[in-house]
């Protein structure tokens, strides 16, 4: 069954109706300062459209990983302030999730008002393994919008989780995909259906174990699989080479060896790396061949030769998916690999390639390195969700919208 979208809901009419929206507002904070408001900005179009159409908008979202109880450091207060700024309208913040304050504020809403509930993960039922407990929370959320309410799923970053505000609540209300979720489904569908070739995938990040499923799913389907980041050193160890103090998953060495043998024509790995004598922004660093990593040193970025080789592959591709940085881009000394690969993808996009940045650290790197976001065809808001989609897994939050 086709997923109903926000347009379907707006066409049906929302004036005077309460609409519960599950947004992804899980932004990085430094104290109470938001360091990257990307997800808030991406969530705004759905909320704005509903408010302007006269809906009483009730937003639920999480921030960080609180332990199922209120924790001031994970309060959505800074998010509410930023959301109000982005929407250009007042955003109320409830003092609880589904308690007395949330109920009172929900009942007092007028057409076009926006209410943000406090961090949904302050309630242990949100992430409970017990479906009955999750359903109780979902029913409490439904009580806030009433019998005439609707549910809009717009948090793509959480659709791979069977959680109360993502899955159970969609079973209890007429449900729709928000602008963001609808766009993500279409974009990732384009990558899985018939991607234009050559199709290149760039995977980085720290652990092979985190990316193994997507490597195994994509390696048989793509023309080129570029591997960098911390996980690369396990592949290096699989070739019998010394990695010094670099990150290495001993338990994954045999797996990496098998992948390199099976997909020798597909997998491309760095030939040179930037190494450091310690994990710090001002560490002593040098560029070496991957054959020459000395004891006591660690690889923190791919080297310039590898950047040039990967750039040649990427600029000739017609479809590119990128997930995971090439190095520790947070440290300026070790950001060149990530920046170089990103710039090659931007160049490919300028030549007509279809490029998708798979959320998470990659999206953060684009913003932190000052790269133009519109240089890519699409920047996903869901790292884990986009990977699981490409692995071919069923995403509970999408499956329930189809029901």
UniProtKB/Swiss-Prot annotation:
Family label: Belongs to the phosphoglycerate kinase family.
Species per Swiss-Prot/TrEMBL record: Rhodococcus opacus (strain B4)
Pfam families membership: PGK
GO annotation, cellular component aspect: cytosol
Substrates-to-products reaction catalysed: (2R)-3-phosphoglycerate + ATP = (2R)-3-phospho-glyceroyl phosphate + ADP
Recorded superkingdom: Bacteria
Gene of this entry: pgk
Protein name: Phosphoglycerate kinase
Subunit structure: Monomer.
Major location (coarse): cytoplasm
Enzyme Commission number(s): 2.7.2.3
Top EC group: transferase
UniProt: ATP binding residues: 211, 299, 330, 359-362
């Amino acid at each position: 069954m086709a997923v109903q979208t926000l347009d379907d809901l707006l066409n049906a009419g929302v004036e005077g109706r309460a609409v519960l929206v599950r947004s992804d507002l899980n932004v990085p904070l430094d104290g109470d300062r938001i360091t990257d408001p990307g997800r808030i900005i991406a969530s705004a179009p759905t909320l704005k459209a509903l408010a302007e159409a006269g809906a009483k908008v009730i937003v639920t979202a999480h921030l960080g990983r609180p332990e199922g109880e209120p924790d001031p450091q994970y309060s959505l207060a800074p998010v509410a302030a930023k959301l109000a700024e982005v929407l250009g309208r007042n955003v109320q913040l409830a003092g609880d999730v589904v308690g007395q304050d949330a109920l009172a504020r929900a009942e007092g809403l007028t057409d076009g008002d926006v209410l943000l509930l406090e961090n949904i993960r302050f309630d242990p039922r949100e992430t409970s393994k017990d479906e009955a407990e999750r359903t109780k929370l979902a029913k409490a959320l439904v009580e806030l919008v009433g019998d005439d309410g609707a549910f809009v799923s717009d948090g793509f970053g959480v659709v791979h989780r069977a959680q109360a505000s993502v899955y159970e609540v969609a079973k209890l209300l007429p449900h729709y995909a928000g602008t963001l979720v609808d766009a993500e489904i279409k974009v990732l569908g384009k990558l899985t259906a018939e991607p234009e070739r050559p199709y290149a995938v760039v995977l980085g990040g720290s652990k092979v174990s985190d990316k193994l499923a997507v490597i195994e799913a994509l390696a048989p389907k793509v023309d080129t699989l570029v591997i960098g980041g911390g996980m690369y050193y396990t592949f290096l160890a699989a070739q019998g080479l010394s990695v010094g103090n670099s990150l290495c998953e001993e338990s994954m060495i045999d797996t990496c060896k098998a992948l390199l043998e099976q997909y020798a024509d597909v997998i491309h790995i760095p030939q040179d790396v930037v190494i450091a004598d310690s994990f710090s922004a001002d560490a002593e660093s040098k560029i070496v061949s991957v054959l020459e990593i000395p004891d006591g040193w660690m690889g923190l970025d791919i080297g310039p030769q590898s950047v040039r080789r990967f750039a040649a592959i990427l600029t000739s591709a017609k479809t590119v998916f990128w997930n995971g940085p090439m190095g520790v881009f947070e440290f300026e000394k070790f950001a060149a690999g990530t920046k170089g690969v990103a710039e090659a993808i931007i160049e490919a996009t300028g030549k007509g390639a279809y490029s998708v940045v798979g959320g998470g650290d990659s999206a953060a790197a684009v913003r932190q390195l000052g790269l133009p976001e519109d240089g890519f065809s699409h920047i996903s808001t869901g790292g884990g969700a986009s990977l699981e989609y490409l692995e071919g897994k069923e995403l509970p939050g999408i499956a329930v919208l189809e029901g």
